[in-house]
UniProtKB/Swiss-Prot annotation:
Organism: Coxiella burnetii (strain RSA 493 / Nine Mile phase I)
Oligomeric form and interacting partners: Heptamer of 7 subunits arranged in a ring. Interacts with the chaperonin GroEL.
Xref: CDD domains: cpn10
Compartments where located: Cytoplasm
Gene name for this UniProt entry: groES
Pfam families for this protein: Cpn10
Predominant place of localization: cytoplasm
NCBIfam families: PRK00364.1-2, PRK00364.1-5, PRK00364.2-2, PRK00364.2-4, PRK00364.2-5
Name of this chain's protein: Co-chaperonin GroES
InterPro entries, per database record: Chaperonin_GroES, Chaperonin_GroES_sf, Chaprnonin_Cpn10_CS, GroES-like_sf
GO molecular function terms listed in the Swiss-Prot or TrEMBL record: ATP binding; metal ion binding; protein folding chaperone; protein-folding chaperone binding; unfolded protein binding
Lineage: Bacteria, Pseudomonadati, Pseudomonadota, Gammaproteobacteria, Legionellales
Amino acid sequence: MKIRPLHDRVVVRRLEEERTSAGGIVIPDSAAEKPSRGEVISVGPGKPLDNGEVRSLDVKVGDQILFGKYAGTEVKLAGDEYIVMREDDIMGVIEK
C-alpha cells in the first residue's frame, strides 16, 4: 500500500538518530527525542498558485531532510510510521 500525497505535501519516514552521546553514554529510549531527520518517500504534484499554475516541489523522493519537532501529521500504514507534511515544514535538504 502506498500514500499519494496531494498538492505540496510530502510523505517522510523518520531516520533513527544515534543512541549514544558524543561522550559514549547510551541514551535510553525514554530520554531520546524523536528524530527530526527523515527520508522523502513520496511527493505531491506541487503547490497550486493563485494564477492557476502548479509550482513543482524542491524536494524529491530519496532526499534526506530536516524538519521541525511538531511538523506534519503522523500516520501508520501497514505497520510502518510516516509523517505527512507540507513542503513549508521542511527546514532543509541534507546534501551528501
